Design a protein with these regions (language model features):
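Glycine-rich phosphate-binding active-site loops on the catalytic face of alpha/beta enzymes
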Residues: 1, 52-70
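Alpha-helix-loop-beta-strand connector modules within alpha/beta enzyme cores
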Residues: 4-33
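Generic structural signal for well-ordered alpha-helices
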Residues: 10-17, 46, 114-121
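Hydrophobic faces of well-ordered beta-strands that scaffold small-molecule active sites
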Residues: 31-37, 55-59
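Glycine-rich beta-alpha junction loops
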Residues: 37-41, 61-64
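Catalytic cores of alpha/beta
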Residues: 38-53
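Short low-complexity, flexible loop/linker segments enriched in glycine and/or proline
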Residues: 71-75
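Extended, intrinsically disordered, low-complexity segments
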Residues: 76-131
Length: 131
């Protein structure tokens, strides 16, 4: 989503935690929150929300777009190789099978997907946290 369309206000999370903690005499951050609609939020907002009890953030929209970016970039790069089975800028008799093979362009989608996942792991302070 376009930055600014979804406005994250972490102070609401803090105030909710403080109220519940005060009312029920619990420990710090007694409620686990899920962060819906994180697309377009700044890293500072995400980190602040985590500090106030966010334990899950939905990133599906960002991941879908990241996968599509890889496929799109592949198609743009090899468009002249994807128009016919035989014949490309290298010659009229040159085969194009290795370019339109789905394993090639799907892999480019996977690589941009992985890159976006790694960014999310970093943003969410979740690098190297599994034993």
């Amino acid at each position: 989503y376009k930055p600014g369309n979804v406005v994250l206000r972490p102070i609401i999370l803090k105030n909710s935690q403080d109220y519940i903690q005060s009312k029920f005499h619990t420990g710090v951050n007694p409620v686990d929150f899920v962060f819906h609609g994180g697309s377009g939020s700044t890293l500072a907002e995400i980190r602040e929300a985590i500090g106030y009890g966010v334990v899950k953030m939905n990133i599906d929209t960002d991941l879908q777009f990241a996968f599509t970016e890889g496929v799109r970039d592949y198609v743009v790069k090899y468009v002249e190789y994807l128009k016919t089975q035989i014949g490309n800028p290298e010659g009229d008799d040159k085969p194009n099978k290795k370019y339109y093979d789905p394993r090639k362009w799907l892999r480019d989608g996977e690589l941009t997907f992985i890159k976006r996942l790694e960014q999310s792991f970093s943003d969410l302070n979740n690098l190297n946290t599994l034993i």
